[in-house]
A protein has these predicted regions:
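A charged N-terminal "starter" segment
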Residues: 330-383
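Alpha-helical transmembrane segments and their immediate juxtamembrane cytosolic regions
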Residues: 1-332
């Protein structure tokens, strides 16, 4: 499917970003704690895996074709965004004395937990991409199997931790793992499966059946809700970010959005990404501003008012990023390539050394040596 018909992905970025803000603000706490749990602890957990799966939709097919050549630029962009976001939250970290922790704790935050509570997304995406690249390179079409096993390991350290805690040897193993990271919701356990899921769906034959996929999404949401309520009823969760039915929901969500064949909306990409990055700062600003103007009751104590204020401020501060476009290459520009004659002579010598006694190379120069100059290259080859 052409990228310009995947506007459904762009449009769902906004609800996904708003769900992330909801997780960190609890918009329905003043109305109904139960409804808030449904929204933030169950349905809201679709948001970040959706972002991972969309990244996988575009990245994994390229990893299969190009290998490390596709991984490098992706890591560079992801880690640059992580660095800039970490610098943005450095003042809050200094205020909270977070950086006063031990070196081991700081490394754990940088590589797994994120340097601020929502920034775990960036190291998780980078680490998950590296794992997926290794799995695709080493196992090909079987790359999904270790990813599923990793997710199950993560699941037993998250929503289904109650089962783990009931088995002392297993609990001891997880307690050892939690010395390295605070949660199994990280790039090692939770990210690879969603990247591969997105990549696998991208390479499937496209079927324009939005109604069918919508039914599948609805049923999978029912299963997710039932699982989440079961986990809460039996108090099984150590943290509630991973569910067994979550990949099913995300898969049907991507299929449904892709089947809608909506035009691309690139402005939403930068805007929603900025909302994601900026909203914790906006939580701090709303709380501080409400105290200054005497509106704490409306903008902090009232959960809906607090959520609305944070969303509005985040959306406004993120608005410039909706208009940002990377600079395009000048169509009038010229490209060139330099041929190292010494390297060509070295390669010819090395190939000649592999030939049996009396054998000779017979170079074929075509298409003007692909723009390098047929006469010049022929002279070197015959020399």
């Amino acid at each position: 499917m052409r990228g310009n018909t995947l506007g459904g992905f762009d449009r769902f970025r906004l609800p996904a970003a708003l769900l992330v803000v909801a997780i960190h603000t609890g918009p329905l706490l003043s109305v109904s704690p139960f409804a808030n749990d449904l929204l933030t602890d169950i349905w809201g957990r679709i948001a970040v895996p959706f972002f991972f799966a969309v990244s996988g939709w575009f990245l994994v097919p390229r990893l299969r074709r190009e290998g490390a050549a596709a991984l490098g630029p992706f890591l560079k962009k992801t880690l640059l965004l992580y660095l800039l976001s970490a610098l943005l939250y450095l003042p809050l970290n200094l205020y909270n004395h977070t950086l006063a922790d031990s070196g081991a704790s700081l490394l754990r935050d940088i590589f797994f937990n994120g340097t601020f509570y929502h920034l775990w997304y960036f190291p998780a995406l980078a680490l998950g991409a590296c794992i997926v690249w290794a799995l695709v390179r080493g196992l090909g079409r079987w790359a999904w199997l270790p990813a599923v096993l990793l997710y199950l390991v993560g699941l037993l350290g998250d929503s289904w931790y109650g089962l783990t805690a009931a088995l002392p040897p297993l609990r001891a193993a997880y307690e050892g793992m939690f010395l390295c990271f605070d949660y199994t919701r990280n790039g090692l356990f939770s990210t690879p499966i969603f990247l591969l899921l997105g990549g696998w769906l991208a390479q499937r034959p496209r079927r324009n059946r939005p109604g069918l996929y919508g039914v599948g999404l609805s049923l999978s949401l029912v299963l997710l809700t039932a699982e989440g309520l079961l986990v809460k009823n039996f108090d099984l969760a150590r943290f509630d970010a991973l569910y067994l039915t979550l990949p099913l929901c995300v898969g049907f969500l991507l299929l449904w959005l892709a089947a809608l064949e909506l035009p691309a909306a690139p402005a939403l990409r930068g805007w929603t990404a900025a909302i994601y990055v900026l909203h914790p700062w906006c939580i701090v600003l709303v709380r501080g501003g409400a105290r200054v103007v005497g509106l704490t009751g409306l903008l902090v104590d009232n959960s809906l008012g607090h959520y609305g204020a944070v969303v509005l401020l985040s959306a406004l501060l993120a608005l410039p990023f909706a208009f940002y476009r990377p600079a395009k290459a000048d169509p009038r520009g010229r490209a060139w390539i330099e041929v190292d004659a010494a390297a060509l002579r070295h390669n010819l010598s090395a190939l000649s050394a592999l030939l049996p006694e009396g054998g000779k190379l017979m170079p074929v120069v075509k298409a003007k040596a692909y723009g390098h100059g047929d006469l010049e290259v022929a002279r070197i080859c015959s020399g």
